[in-house]
Amino acid sequence: MKLSVVLALFIIFQLGAASLMRNWMFDFEKELEHDYDDSEIGFHNIHSLMARSRRGDKVKICGTKVLKMVMVMCGGECSSTNENIATECCEKMCTMEDITTKCCPSR
């Protein structure tokens, strides 16, 4: 007899707790913003998920790759003699704009 009363109280307690938990979760999910549309924030979130090496437009190129990039960008060899573009782009990262301003400023 005592066992059945304890079992009935336990079942009632479990049903009440489950009902409260379900209501709490429903209220919590209702407070979340599902239709949040901000393209700038979304871009930054996607941007931060990308690998660090792919985030910027600067690239690290060394050796003959620099010569090929200069040939493509300038249509010939680097006209600037005071800067070593190959060493600079290998040690530090360069953008395409850096290559064009340093090697062929007339372009």
Curated annotation (Swiss-Prot):
Gene3D superfamilies: Insulin-like. It is found in: Secreted. One of its GO terms (biological process) is dauer larval development. The keyword Aminoacyl-tRNA synthetase does not apply. Disulfide bonds join 62-90, 74-103, 78-104, 89-94. Pfam families: Ins_beta. GO terms for cellular component: extracellular region. PROSITE patterns: INSULIN. Keywords: Cleavage on pair of basic residues, Disulfide bond, Secreted, Signal. Its main location: secreted. GO terms for molecular function: hormone activity. Residues 1-19 form the signal peptide. InterPro entries: Insulin-like_regulatory, Insulin-like_sf, Insulin_CS, Nem_insulin-like_b-type. Residues 20-55 form a propeptide. Belongs to the insulin family. This is Probable insulin-like peptide beta-type 3. It comes from Caenorhabditis elegans.
